[in-house]
Design a protein with these regions (language model features):
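Cytosolic regulatory regions of ion transport systems
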Residues: 1-449
Length: 449
């Protein structure tokens, strides 16, 4: 597809890379010429220097012929104006990044009077991700599919875990409609068969219905979060506190800027707001950080978040949630079993890629959702089986899938099925697939050739 991206910041750059990898025709609009030249050369994209809300620039970029127009600058108003112009000029779909809470009210979201195809708020998406993590604190990560019907969680198999030494067949007998999709063993990813055995140190990715996963989560380690400490009063904290408003979790927030601390204290009177440096060891000890069930370190400085997270882990914090913007730093912290990393850039890019791939329809089936897990090494895909699909009506055992492919779930008439080889695919089904294969755009890409 022909896709125009406006803005070459962190999200825009990552989007260009992902779109080029999937063989889309990408045009980049960026005000800074040196940035544009560097990225145009690196990713082999066509570039236009200028303001994405400028009619002449959009005309030069031939926005009238684009399939998807994506505005990702750091200015909400520029994104919205450029997308409105692009739509009027003939762009088929428009996606905008909007971060300001003022533009996240119910009227703007639900009525969508500006006609955007998708509104992406990285901080709000990250807050929702953290809220899921707070709900399931024993999991290293939590992803949702099929409008929340299916959940994918990552767990560490610890020394005293009852999962150690258990085969996949034994696991399925014990837990019913829950599947181990992938095992990460010392960096090697495995799609397990029935005879595969879990070992101490494995990171396992498990999927199932929300209610079944809640029971499994309790089985792993019956621990809930009653006290939460937030470090940093940014947009993520703002959205997270709104999400948790009706929750019974006791929340304390530490913020070093006076105006922000006062604002949060007024907006969220139920939250204990402390003025100070939440990354300072002495203050954390003074505020009894070790007594909290979970701490989310959400400042704007990656290094401070990582170092603070490491200190908190030394205090024995059960659940460490750490914001890291630069993916190059993930390896430093990703091996620690009590830590959940959130990367707003990656969450935003994944959201946009869900949409783009959903619009990139094949004749027989459509790929309408995509999630990256394990730092992008695992893809979870959602396909819809359409009328002329050749695999409709066949048993899963009759289909020869390529190595590294697992059918995790079938969504049929709003209900989730966690299949065996005897289940058949029907027209209208949505299937959730976990795979080690990259850049899959069609369900037939998953079959042996």
């Amino acid at each position: 597809m022909r896709i125009i991206v406006v803005g070459a910041g962190k999200v825009g750059t990552a989007l260009c890379r992902s779109l080029v990898e999937e063989k889309h025709d990408v045009i980049l609009i960026e005000e800074k010429e040196e940035v544009l030249k560097r990225l145009s050369k690196r990713y082999d994209v066509m570039g236009f220097a200028g303001n994405g809300a400028n009619f002449k620039i959009l005309e030069q970029a031939e926005v009238s012929n684009c399939d998807v127009f994506i505005a990702m600058t750091d200015k909400d108003e520029v994104n919205m104006i450029s997308a409105v112009l692009a739509k009027q000029m003939g762009a088929k779909e428009t996606i905008v990044r909007v971060r300001n809470p003022e533009y996240s009210n119910a009227y703007f979201k639900d009525k969508n009077f500006l006609g955007f195809s998708l509104v992406v708020n990285p901080e709000l998406l990250t807050a929702r991700y953290i809220a899921n993590t707070v709900e399931f604190p024993n999991a290293l990560s939590v992803e949702t599919f099929a409008n929340g019907r299916v959940i994918l969680m990552a767990f560490k198999v610890t020394e005293n875990s009852q999962l150690s030494g258990m085969t996949m067949e034994q696991f399925r007998r014990k837990f019913g409609n829950i599947l181990v999709c992938t095992i990460d063993r010392q960096g090697e990813l495995i799609i397990p068969d029935g005879n595969a055995t879990m070992q101490i140190g494995d990171k396992i990715y498990v999927t199932g219905k929300r209610v079944d996963m809640a029971l499994f989560h309790s089985y792993i380690k019956p621990k809930s979060i009653k006290k939460l400490l937030l470090i940093g009063a940014g947009r993520i904290s703002y959205y997270l506190l709104n999400i948790l408003k009706n929750n019974r979790i006791k929340v304390k927030l530490i913020e070093q800027k006076m105006d922000r601390a006062q604002n949060f204290s007024q907006v969220f009177p139920e939250v204990s707001v402390i003025l100070g440096d939440g990354t300072a060891k002495d203050l954390l000890l003074e505020e009894s950080a070790a007594s909290y069930d979970a701490v989310a370190t959400l400042t704007g400085v990656d290094e401070e978040n990582i170092i603070t997270s490491m200190f908190l882990e030394s205090l024995g914090i059960h659940k460490n949630i750490t914001k890291v913007n630069r993916t190059s730093l993930l390896e430093i912290i990703d091996t620690r079993e009590t830590t959940t990393i959130v990367t707003p850039k990656s969450i935003a890019v994944d959201t946009v890629m869900h949409f783009v791939r959903g619009r990139y329809n094949a004749k027989d089936s459509s790929l309408d959702a995509l999630h990256h897990v394990a730092n992008g090494r695992i893809e979870t895909l959602q396909f819809q089986i359409k009328e002329n699909n050749k695999i409709a009506g066949k048993k899963l055992s009759e289909l020869e899938f390529a190595n590294g492919v697992l059918i995790a779930a079938i969504i049929r008439n709003g209900k989730s099925i966690f299949p065996t080889g005897e289940d058949r695919l029907a027209i209208g089904d949505k299937i959730v697939i976990v795979t080690l294969l990259q850049n899959v755009t069609h369900i037939y890409d998953l079959l042996k050739r």
